[in-house]
C-alpha cells in the first residue's frame, strides 16, 4: 500500500512538472516578433485562418494557465487549431516589444494575457481583455469557446449572412 502511494505521488509530481515544462518557454524574448507575426499572417492566409496573438510572458502565471486550459481541453484545442495560427508575443523585462504592441493599439493596458486577433491580411480586428474569460482562479471554457467562435473566419464571412 505504501508503494502505491509513493508511485501515485511520483506520478502526480512528474505530471505537474511536465505540464509546467510545456508552458515554461511559450514566449521568446529574443524573437523577432515583427518577422514571426508576418510569417504567421502568411501561414494564416494560406490556410484561410486568422492569427491569434497571445500577449504575455513566461513570468505570467495566467498566460500559462490559459495555454494549459486550451491545450488540455479537446474542444478548445480543436477550435483554436481549426481557425487560428497562434503566436505568443513576448512582454518582459528582457524585451517589451514596444513597437509591436504600439502597432496593435497598446493592448498591454489590459494586463496579461491579452489577445489580439488579426485577419488573414494582418489587420487587427479585435483585442480581448482576458479578464472577461476568467472565472475564479482559472478560465471559463465556455467563454473561451465563445471568444474563439465569435472571432473566427466563419463568423466574419459575409457569405454566412447573405440569406
Whereabouts are the PLM-identified features?
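Conserved redox-active cysteine motifs that mediate thiol-disulfide chemistry
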Residues: 55-70
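Thiol-based oxidoreductase modules, predominantly thioredoxin-like and allied folds used
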Residues: 31, 55, 73-98
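A short beta-strand-turn-helix
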Residues: 32-50
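Non-catalytic, surface beta->alpha helical segment in thiol-disulfide oxidoreductase systems
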Residues: 109-161
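N-proximal helix/coil linker or "cap" segments that precede and/or mark the start of modular domains
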Residues: 18-31
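Loop/turn elements at helix/coil->beta-strand transitions in domains of secreted/extracellular proteins
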Residues: 47-51, 82-87, 112-113, 120
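Bacterial Sec-dependent N-terminal signal peptides
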Residues: 1-21
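Structural alpha/beta surface segment adjacent to cysteine/selenocysteine redox centers
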Residues: 92-112, 121
